[in-house]
A protein has these predicted regions:
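Nucleotide phosphate-binding/pyrophosphate-handling subdomain across enzymes
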Residues: 4-74
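Hydrophobic, well-ordered secondary-structure elements that form the walls
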Residues: 26, 78, 133
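Short amphipathic alpha-helical segments
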Residues: 36, 63-65, 91-92, 124, ...
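Short, solvent-exposed amphipathic alpha-helical segments in soluble enzyme
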Residues: 39-42, 66-70, 94-96, 129, ...
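Structural beta-sheet core signal
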Residues: 51-53, 80, 135
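C-terminal helical cap/extension that packs against the catalytic core
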Residues: 69-129
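A glycine-rich beta-strand to alpha-helix segment
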Residues: 118-149, 154
Length: 154
């Protein structure tokens, strides 16, 4: 029981939608954790890998911006949502769009979306057979997975 509790939100299977598109959720909020998720995902049989990433804290996002971009680069489809502030105020002059721009600088495509319902709809409209979708971050991004899975489809 302790092992299961300690593994909560670590590559946790949420469910499927459109028959065979798998959704996973992970608490990762540091570039090394995201790189580990990318490595694990690339070892799974899949078509395209999607990641919805919610950066955790303005300070971490500012300090590790390039590292986050490199860690997210292996994913085929990258969606960045608003920074989860935790207890911080944005005194760092940083936004989620800055991360999208940094990802673009290294030659990858990413999009910024703030509304979770719109993110879920976008993924449902664009994901195809055998894709893998990951929701990643220490904040509220975990709410998106249940919006995607079959028992929550429109």
């Amino acid at each position: 029981m302790c092992i299961r509790d300690s593994a909560h939100r670590r590559y946790e299977f949420v469910g499927t939608f459109h028959g065979n598109i798998s959704v996973f959720d992970d608490y990762a909020h540091h570039p090394t954790e995201i790189q580990a998720i990318a490595n694990a995902t690339m070892q799974k049989k899949h078509n395209k890998a999607w990641i919805v990433f919610q950066p955790h804290t303005y300070s971490r996002t500012k300090n590790l911006l390039h590292d986050f971009a490199k860690a997210l680069a292996p994913f085929d489809n990258i969606i960045i949502t608003d920074i989860y502030a935790a207890r911080e105020k944005n005194t760092f002059d940083i936004s989620a769009q800055d991360l999208v721009d940094e990802i673009t600088k290294i030659g990858r495509k990413a999009i910024y979306m703030s509304n979770f319902e719109e993110i879920a709809k976008y993924i449902k409209d664009h994901a195809i057979n055998n894709d893998i979708v990951l929701t990643v971050g220490a904040g509220t991004v975990t709410k998106i997975g249940p919006m995607l899975v079959d028992n929550h489809e429109d």
